[in-house]
Amino acid sequence: MAKRKYKRDSKIPEYEFYILDDVVHFILKGRAMVDGTYAAVNMDKWLIISKYEWFLGKSGYPVCYELGKIQLHRFVYTLILGTCPSGLYVDHIDRNKLNNTDGNLRLVTPQQNSFNKSTNTNKKGVKKISDNNYMATVVKDGVRRQIKNIPTEIAAAEIYNMMAEELFGEFAAFNKI
């Protein structure tokens, strides 16, 4: 498959956007325009960001191909503090890939980033082990912590949330109950 080359047009892209509390919310280009998917950045970054075309990538992150396929949260971080140190990731605190405001981005280790992962099932750390028994599991530093024989899935999710908060602190991803 041939690589597509993106040629920089001298024309600055036009965006549909609105400003709320010093945050610019703008519709991403491409398929996101049909859905009306908005990304958010601080006003002081907007003048630089708006010079490029930002698309909604397959991973759900806004991405710019003109800059060598960089994701928006990484680009914003470089505008704030410069290059991301080797071995660290730029993480969205609220886990919203479209919220790229300064206060929502932080540097994390790969392990901290893994604590903050979401699941599609809303049963993070919960497994059914028999008809009326569930298990809550948390793994940190290669050590598995489990509580078994929990009567309901909701109770197991609540127990997982408590264990995750204790072990992962601000990096914990919780089940919505």
What are these regions (language model features)?
Residues 1-89, 95-167, 171-177:
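Conserved recognition-core residues within compact binding domains
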